[in-house]
C-alpha cells in the first residue's frame, strides 16, 4: 500500500480501541510507539434473569462508553482529530455480536458468558461423540468457549433473535463497524469461535451444518492490518474523530499484544501475566495437540498460529491475597509511597526458594478438553510462624504461578516440538522483579521484560499504521518498536530445586482434583458442559 503519511510527519498519531472484559480504552500513540494519551471507562456485562451463567454485552451503553473514551483520549492528548492517521480495534476473544439483515446489532455476549452448558453437552454427543474432536482438529478450539453452543442456545431459547440474525462478528469487529459501517472479521479473533479453519484462515461452515445450525451468517474475513473503511460522518459526531479517518481491521487481544511485544517469529514465546496468565508459542504452521490440552489460535501474522495455554485467575488470586490478608502492608506501602506488591516482594525475597514446602492449589495446568480446577487451598502449611507467614505464602503464590506456566509450556513443547530459548514476560505480573526472576529460575530460560508491559493497544496501533500505509509490515514494526527494560537469567541450582517442587505439586494437585470429582470440594472454575 502506498504511504498516506510519512514518518517524518511527527504530528500524526494512531488510535487503538482496546475492549477488555472489564473496560474499554482508547489509546493514542505517536508513530514511534510512545503512548500519548488514554481514555478509559469500566463496563459491566448484563446477567439475564433466570438465565444462569449469562453475561450479555450491552451494545448501546458500551458504544456510548467507547465514544466517550475516544473523546477523552483526544482531549487528554491535546491534539485535533485530523491528526489521527488511523484507528483500529482489538477486544477480548470469544465475545460475539449478531446483526440483522439491515446491519443493526441485535444481540451480543461477553467472553465470560456461560449459559450454554447444556448445549455443550449435547454437541459433544454428536457423530458418536466425535464432534468436538472434529472441531478441535480443524479450528484449534473446543466447544466450551466457542460460538457454536451459544448459537444453539439462541436457537433453543431465543428463536426470535436466532431467526433475525444475518451476520456474526467479534466485539473488535463491532467497534470497527460502528465507526465505519463495514462488517468483517479477522482470523485472530474469529478463530476463537471454533468456526474458522486454522489452515485456510477462513470459515468452515460445515461445522455449523454438522451441528444443525445456520451457516449463512458468516461475515467476510479480512486480515489484521487491512484497510476496512473510514469513519462515517454519523460516527464522527459521536466519537470526536474526523469523518474519513481510516478504520483498519484489528484482532484478538492476546495476538495483538504479542505483536506489540515483537513476538512475531516462529518459536518465539511469551508469558502474559494479567488476571489470567497466557503462555503462547508461535508455530510456523498449524498443528494441534493430540491430547486436546492446548488451544491453537491464528496469529495476526498471516500463515502463523499460536499454541496458547491459560492459567486461571493468577492475577486475581494475588489481588485476593493482598486484599484479604495484607491490610497492614497496604498501609505501610501507602506511607512509603510504593506499591503494596513491591513491599510484599521485598518481604518474600527473604523467604528461601521453595517457600518451605508450601504448595498453593489454585489454577491447574490447562486441560482444554476437560477443563476444571481443584478447590483453592494451601497445602503443607506449618504452624511455625517464622516459616509460615504472609511472606512465605506470597512467595509460594509467585512460585506456583511460574510452575503452572512451566507445565503449560511443556505441554506445548510435547506436541509442537518447539523448545523456546527465552521468554518474553509482559502484563502486570512482569512489574514484579522477584516474580520475573522466579519465572526464569522455574522455567530455566532467560526472561526478557519489555518497557511497555501492556502491549495490546500498541499492537493494535501498529495494525492501524499498516492499514493506513504508514508502516510496511506488522512484524518488522513490532520488532522495531519494542524496547527492553531488563533481562533475568536463570539460576541452575534454583531451577533444579523448582523441578522437584513442580513434580510434587502436580502429584498433590491430582489428589485435590479427586476431592472435586467426589463432590467433597468446589472447583475454582469449571468449563461449561462438564
Curated annotation (Swiss-Prot):
CC terms in the record's Gene Ontology section: cytoplasm
Residue pairs linked by disulfide bridges in the UniProt entry: none
InterPro entries associated with the record: AI-2_kinase, ATPase_NBD, Carb_kinase_FGGY, FGGY_C, FGGY_Carb_Kinase, FGGY_N
GO molecular function: autoinducer-2 kinase activity
Keyword Hydrolase assigned: no
One of the GO BP terms on file: single-species biofilm formation
Cellular localisation: Cytoplasm
One Pfam family, short name: FGGY_N
Keyword Protein biosynthesis in annotation: no
Enzyme class, broadest EC rank: transferase
Alphabetical keyword list: Cytoplasm, Kinase, Transferase
Chemical reaction(s) catalysed: (S)-4,5-dihydroxypentane-2,3-dione + ATP = (2S)-2-hydroxy-3,4-dioxopentyl phosphate + ADP + H(+)
EC number: 2.7.1.189
NCBIfam families, sorted: PRK10939.1
Protein family according to the UniProt entry: Belongs to the FGGY kinase family.
Record's function text: Catalyzes the phosphorylation of autoinducer-2 (AI-2) to phospho-AI-2, which subsequently inactivates the transcriptional regulator LsrR and leads to the transcription of the lsr operon. Phosphorylates the ring-open form of (S)-4,5-dihydroxypentane-2,3-dione (DPD), which is the precursor to all AI-2 signaling molecules, at the C5 position. Required for the regulation of the lsr operon and many other genes.
Identification of the protein by name: Autoinducer-2 kinase
Organism, scientific name: Escherichia coli (strain K12)
Gene from which the chain derives: lsrK
Amino acid at each position: 500500500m502506498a504511504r498516506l503519511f510519512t514518518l517524518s510527519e511527527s504530528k500524526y498519531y494512531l488510535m487503538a480501541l482496546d475492549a477488555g472484559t472489564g473496560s474499554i480504552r482508547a489509546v493514542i500513540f505517536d508513530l514511534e510507539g510512545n503512548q500519548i494519551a488514554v481514555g478509559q471507562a469500566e463496563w459491566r456485562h448484563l446477567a439475564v434473569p433466570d438465565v444462569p451463567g449469562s453475561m450479555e454485552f450491552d451494545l448501546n451503553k458500551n458504544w456510548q462508553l467507547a465514544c466517550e473514551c475516544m473523546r477523552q483520549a483526544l482531549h487528554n492528548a491535546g491534539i485535533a482529530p485530523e491528526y489521527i492517521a488511523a484507528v483500529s480495534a482489538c477486544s477480548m476473544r470469544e465475545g460475539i455480536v449478531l446483526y440483522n439483515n439491515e446491519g443493526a446489532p441485535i444481540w451480543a455476549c461477553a467472553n465470560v458468558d456461560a449459559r450454554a452448558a447444556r448445549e455443550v453437552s449435547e454437541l459433544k454427543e454428536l457423530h458418536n461423540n466425535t464432534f468436538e474432536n472434529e472441531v478441535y482438529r480443524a479450528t484449534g478450539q473446543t466447544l466450551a468457549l466457542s460460538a457454536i453452543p451459544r448459537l444453539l442456545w439462541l436457537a433453543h431459547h431465543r428463536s426470535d433473535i436466532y431467526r433475525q440474525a444475518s451476520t456474526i462478528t467479534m466485539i473488535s469487529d463491532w467497534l470497527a463497524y460502528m465507526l465505519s459501517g463495514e462488517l468483517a472479521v479477522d482470523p485472530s479473533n474469529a478463530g476463537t469461535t471454533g468456526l474458522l479453519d486454522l489452515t485456510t484462515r477462513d470459515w468452515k461452515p460445515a461445522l455449523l451444518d454438522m451441528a444443525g445450525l445456520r451457516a449463512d451468517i458468516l461475515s467476510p474475513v479480512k486480515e489484521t492490518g487491512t484497510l476496512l473503511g473510514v469513519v462515517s460522518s454519523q460516527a464522527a459526531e459521536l466519537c470526536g474523530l474526523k469523518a474519513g479517518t481510516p478504520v483498519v481491521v484489528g484482532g484478538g487481544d492476546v495476538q495483538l499484544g504479542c505483536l506489540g511485544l515483537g513476538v512475531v517469529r516462529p518459536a518465539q514465546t511469551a508469558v502474559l501475566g494479567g488476571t489470567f496468565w497466557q503462555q503462547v508459542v508461535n508455530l510456523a504452521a498449524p498443528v494441534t495437540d493430540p491430547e486436546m490440552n492446548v488451544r491453537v489460535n491464528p496469529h495476526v501474522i498471516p500463515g502463523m498460529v499460536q499454541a496458547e495455554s491459560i492459567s486461571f485467575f493468577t492475577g486475581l488470586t494475588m489481588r485476593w491475597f493482598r486484599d484479604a490478608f495484607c491490610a497492614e502492608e497496604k498501609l505501610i506501602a501507602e506511607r512509603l509511597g510504593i506499591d503494596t506488591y513491591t513491599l510484599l516482594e521485598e518481604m518474600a525475597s527473604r523467604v528461601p526458594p521453595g517457600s518451605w514446602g508450601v504448595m498453593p492449589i489454585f489454577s491447574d495446568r490447562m486441560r482444554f478438553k476437560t477443563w476444571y480446577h481443584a478447590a483453592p487451598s494451601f497445602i503443607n502449611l506449618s504452624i511455625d510462624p517464622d516459616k509460615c507467614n504472609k511472606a512465605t505464602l506470597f512467595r509460594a503464590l509467585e512460585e506456583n504461578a511460574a510452575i503452572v506456566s512451566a507445565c503449560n509450556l511443556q505441554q506445548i513443547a510435547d506436541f509442537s516440538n518447539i523448545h523456546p530459548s527465552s521468554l518474553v514476560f509482559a502484563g502486570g505480573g512482569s512489574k514484579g522483579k522477584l516474580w520475573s526472576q522466579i519465572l526464569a529460575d522455574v522455567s530455566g530460560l532467560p526472561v526478557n521484560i519489555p518497557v511497555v508491559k501492556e502491549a495490546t493497544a500498541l499492537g493494535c496501533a501498529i495494525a492501524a499504521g499498516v492499514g493506513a500505509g504508514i508502516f510496511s509490515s506488522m512484524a518488522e514494526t513490532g520488532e522495531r518498536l519494542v524496547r527492553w527494560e531488563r533481562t533475568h537469567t536463570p539460576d541452575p541450582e534454583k531451577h533444579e530445586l523448582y523441578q522437584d517442587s513442580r513434580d510434587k505439586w502436580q502429584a498433590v494437585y491430582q489428589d485435590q482434583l479427586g476431592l472435586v470429582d467426589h463432590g467433597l470440594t468446589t472447583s475454582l472454575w469449571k468449563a461449561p458442559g462438564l
